[in-house]
Amino acid sequence: TLEQIPVLTTTWAAWKEAHPDTEVMSTEGGPETDMFERYYANDRNGIHSLNPSDKRLHGKDVVLGLDLKGEAKAYSYTALIEQPLVEETLGRQPIIVLHERSSATAVAFSRIVHGRTLSFKGKSKNPHRRSAEVTASGEGERPNYEPWLIEDTQTGSTWRAVSGECIEGELKGSRLEMLPGMTGFWYAWSRFYPAADLFGTLAESPE
């Protein structure tokens, strides 16, 4: 089995805010249009249009999937938008799953810091991302990115939700351990993990 490593699917603005010293290897290349736009919009599941065997979500509902010590669970992005901070235990490990709405970023961390299990609550606003921002052509100015901040209830320290970095308080300089997860479509995740638990329910189909 290949070792899983943590990866993050996010926006450039959110990444740059969390990692301002990032080196960009190239700004050239890339198509002017999204070649997968039609695929995202239609009901086809994969190249061969696989029918999801697990009907708890629509095939193309996006999930963050975790597999910790043999215990697997998927977190529906739709459900996380409504409840963007989830604390629980998975694989006998206390974890937190966060969804920053403005950057459409879902990420999971261990809640153990320096041998102590922390609990968290939101500190700053976590506004929904407006559709105009998602589909902007790049012309004109976009609203400034504001990172979502959370606070641990044990020390009152302030943390960035996307990077897991503590930026203020007793634990300043500490960083939550990011857990290996996979962001993908439900039809793909559920085929590899057919018995996995799910955070979220089937959304109403658009009329």
Role assignments for model-derived ranges:
Residues 1-207:
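Mid-to-C-terminal functional-domain signal that highlights helix-capping/loop sites
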